[in-house]
Amino acid sequence: MRKLSFLVLLFLFFLNACAKEKKEASIIKASNQDLEIVAAYTEAYKALSQGDPYFAAKKFLEAELLFPQSEWAPRSALLASYSYYMQNYYTEALNNLERFLITYPNSKNLVYAHYLIAMCYYETIEGEKKDSAPIYKAKAKFNYISKNFPNTDFALDSEFKLDLIDDILAAKEMYIGRHYIKKGKWIAAINRFKTVASEYDQTVFIEEALHR
């Protein structure tokens, strides 16, 4: 569901721009290079819609290379990253997104790149018993989006994701606190519960933390 919702947001955003570019392409006589990029772009969209995101990523990157100075290039790079994300190739998606931010620092689609980076980290969160690194990286990026791109759908969804992340972090503190209790490390346990009470007081764990 999460991936589908992002796909809808992304495609809605690009729909008008792509339609306008195709209309202009039909009026102006296209060069061979123009035709190549349109063909690659169309093939990539088709592959993505038919459930072959890895091939779609390859074609989007080809489109970017064919016309590096055009508006097609940053869109192609971003959609290639999304295609990797759809295939659960999060490392490839993150690498391409970081390249996107460096290559296209003035792109009007920066919010999408930041959001997709956050989602790549978010998708790798495995719960309170696992590595915390993806949790904090996702939280930092969602916070960045909320502060720097307010009044957008992505900021709204980022705030929702931040609430979910706080639940996970609170659960982690409670898990560690309970573990300390089993070991008889009372002070260490109390400190964990205090963290929940002070930093995650809006989560479902607040009552248990205060009771402890």
Predicted regions: what is each one?
Residues 1-18:
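Sec-dependent bacterial lipoprotein signal peptides
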Residues 14-212:
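Acidic, polar-rich low-complexity tracts and alpha-helical solenoid repeat scaffolds
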